[in-house]
């Protein structure tokens, strides 16, 4: 069933007036004024995500400046994190799991820039699993990217052949999530298991407001 709501206010005005910052349900608390500022990335502008792409929460304008001073080119993409990012995998066979769709957009300019880096032998460093899914969704079998706006349900788990991403920055995820499968696919199950054991031993912070790791 589809319900149409008639209002003199725009969607964004309604969100700003009565909406709440969509902090993850596992926090088990109401959002606060601090969340409105802290639970958004330095890139965040448009409304629509049910959660923040949390790897980028560790970035600041100062860090971005230092990255650029090292000679790196920062390329921005647009994505809207979907509700399924919190959905646990309940199937015994992970291949039977149906992945959630997320809205993504890769501009022509961004695609050209990333393709140029790959063609010149450079590396693509990605912040976040959602960005990783976005890039892999927009690439052909040879790894070349094309402009795209739409949805993706690309499901990445061990055995997947990566086409674009060379290095990945990501937070520590829930053990029964599609996100842990994605990072295990990228780095290998045993390495991720070892990294998580090290994180637990040293009391790293997990999940959205937690620490992140760089997978080389």
Residue positions per predicted region:
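Surface-exposed, charge/polar-rich loops and edge strands
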Residues: 1-216
């Amino acid at each position: 069933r589809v319900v149409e709501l008639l209002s003199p206010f725009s969607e964004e005005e309604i969100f700003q007036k009565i909406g709440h910052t969509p902090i993850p349900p596992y926090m088990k608390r109401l959002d606060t004024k601090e969340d409105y500022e802290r639970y958004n990335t330095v890139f965040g502008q448009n409304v629509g995500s049910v959660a923040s792409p949390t790897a980028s929460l560790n970035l600041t304008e100062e860090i971005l400046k230092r990255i650029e001073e090292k000679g790196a080119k920062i390329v921005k993409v647009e994505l809207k994190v979907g509700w399924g990012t919190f959905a646990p995998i309940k199937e015994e066979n992970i291949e039977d799991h149906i992945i959630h769709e997320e809205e993504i957009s890769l501009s022509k300019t961004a695609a050209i820039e990333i393709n140029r880096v790959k063609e010149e032998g450079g590396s693509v460093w990605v912040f976040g699993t959602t960005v990783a899914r976005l890039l892999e969704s927009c690439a052909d079998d040879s790894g070349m990217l094309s402009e795209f706006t739409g949805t993706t349900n690309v499901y990445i788990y061990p055995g997947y052949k990566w086409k674009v991403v060379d290095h990945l920055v990501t937070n520590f995820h829930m053990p029964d999530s599609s996100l842990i499968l994605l990072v295990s696919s990228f780095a290998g199950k045993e390495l991720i298991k070892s990294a998580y054991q090290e994180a637990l031993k040293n009391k790293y912070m997990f999940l959205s407001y937690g620490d992140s790791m760089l997978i080389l």
